């Protein structure tokens, strides 16, 4: 059955406009993005099938172009649209972080990091440089590694922190495996960086281990 024949209150676009985006499930939101279905399958049903085939919404968003465009109803144009939407959301979060206290909204920082590095296929180490008021100065991707590890040099992190005249840092790296549990090596690195930064009176506020669907906080675990 085509969506046009549904009661108006059940159509995804009309439902969003009248009740707000938060009231829609993943399939309905994805259907709005898809706009149309394929022969014999409306957009909502196509969205359901895609979510089932990819396994989750985060997996769909993290899919590389070859896997994405191999699915019926998807292609390079949809992939470009999706990447553009993701980048717009990341930039909007970056603007908000520059205007406010980064610690006042930990979820905002989490969302930014998930959008920035959560879907990367290799480990990427990011440093968020903050002022004395915890305002964003800059975000830099400092190191990149392999599928399972990245080498991080505390001296380079310290050098960049001093160059930015940062008073505090938040560090983060992704786990391409999709498992956000910190490793023992992650904890050792965090302790090493914290001690190095303390020598020049710079605070290490948090370390996030990031995947497409989650960002695990060292501070919330009491490890900082």
UniProtKB/Swiss-Prot annotation:
Q: Name one GO biological process term.
A: proteolysis
Q: Which Gene3D superfamilies match?
A: 5' to 3' exonuclease, C-terminal subdomain (1.10.150.20), Cytidine Deaminase, domain 2 (3.40.140.10)
Q: Which residues are noted in the entry as Zn(2+)-binding?
A: 173, 175, 186
Which CDD domains does the protein's record reference? MPN_DUF2466 (cd08071)
The SS bond pairs are none
Residues of the MPN domain: 102-224
Q: Pfam family example for this protein?
A: UPF0758_N
Superkingdom field: Bacteria
Q: Which UniProt keywords apply?
A: Hydrolase, Metal-binding, Metalloprotease, Protease, Zinc
- Molecular function terms in GO for this entry? metal ion binding; metallopeptidase activity
Q: Where is this motif: JAMM motif?
A: 173-186
Describe the family membership recorded for this protein in Swiss-Prot or TrEMBL. Answer: Belongs to the UPF0758 family.
**Identification of the protein by name:** UPF0758 protein CV_3079
Species this protein is from: Chromobacterium violaceum (strain ATCC 12472 / DSM 30191 / JCM 1249 / CCUG 213 / NBRC 12614 / NCIMB 9131 / NCTC 9757 / MK)
């Amino acid at each position: 059955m085509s969506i046009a024949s549904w009661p108006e209150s059940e159509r995804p676009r009309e439902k969003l406009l009248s009740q707000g985006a938060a009231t829609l499930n993943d399939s309905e939101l994805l259907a709005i993005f898809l706009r149309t279905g394929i022969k014999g399958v409306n957009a909502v049903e196509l969205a359901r099938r895609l979510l089932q085939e990819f396994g989750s919404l985060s997996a769909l968003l993290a899919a590389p172009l070859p896997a994405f465009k191999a699915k019926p109803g998807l292609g390079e144009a949809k992939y470009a649209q999706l990447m553009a939407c993701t980048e717009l959301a990341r930039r909007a979060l970056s603007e908000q972080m520059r205007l406010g206290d980064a610690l006042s909204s930990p979820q905002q920082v989490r969302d930014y990091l998930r959008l920035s590095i959560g879907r990367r296929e290799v480990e990427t180490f990011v440093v968020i440089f903050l002022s004395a008021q915890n305002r964003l100065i800059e975000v830099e991707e400092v190191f990149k590694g392999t599928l399972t590890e990245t080498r991080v040099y505390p001296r380079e992190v310290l050098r960049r922190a001093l160059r930015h005249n940062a008073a505090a840092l938040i560090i983060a790296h992704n786990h391409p495996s999709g498992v956000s549990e910190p490793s023992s090596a992650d904890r050792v690195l965090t302790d090493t960086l914290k001690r190095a930064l303390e020598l020049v009176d710079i605070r290490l506020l948090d370390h996030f281990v990031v995947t497409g669907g989650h960002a695990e906080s060292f501070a919330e675990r009491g490890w900082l």
